[in-house]
Amino acid sequence: MKNIIFFGDSLTAGHGLPAANSFPSLLQQRLDQESLPYKTYNYGVSGETSAGGRQRLAAVLTRHPIDVFVLALGANDGIRGIPVRETTQNLQFIVDAVRRQYPQGQLVLAGLEFPFDLGPLGGHRLAHYATEFKALFRTLADKNSLPFVPFLLQGVLGRRELNLADGVHPNAAGQRILAENVWQVLGPLLQQAVSS
């Protein structure tokens, strides 16, 4: 049995939902259905920024041998307006640390977009930040040759019926879409690894 670590924030943790409704748990069901020999571990922490993930990483890396590491951090950086350069440095640190400790492991990066509708009050600076924030994930994926989920919240962001009452966190139906978004990239990767 091989291990998949999901390292993220409240989107990964399944904030406000039973653990079984989080997208890593839903992906475990999919893996079991397809008889793929992987166990998922959900290391999502609500409210975590990329800096928090960087601090927490060492403890996570020692808990299980890692075959696949899905990095899904950055949403809280965007909400707080943390400079894109800092977020990029923190995520690069995480990528480097995982590769150093598990050189045979496979990393997958989940991309994000600025989580608010800029609207008429957004202003030029906020629009510029949103553009830079979105681009940092693809740039990081390209630089490190990482399989890339372009937008974790694709099909969910801004749709009231797919989010909790706070309008930010996906509900159970929204988490199912997140699972599908990740599976589009992760599934073929795992199937290829098993067949090779």
What are these regions (language model features)?
Residues 1-65:
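Serine-esterase "nucleophile elbow" of acetyl-processing enzymes
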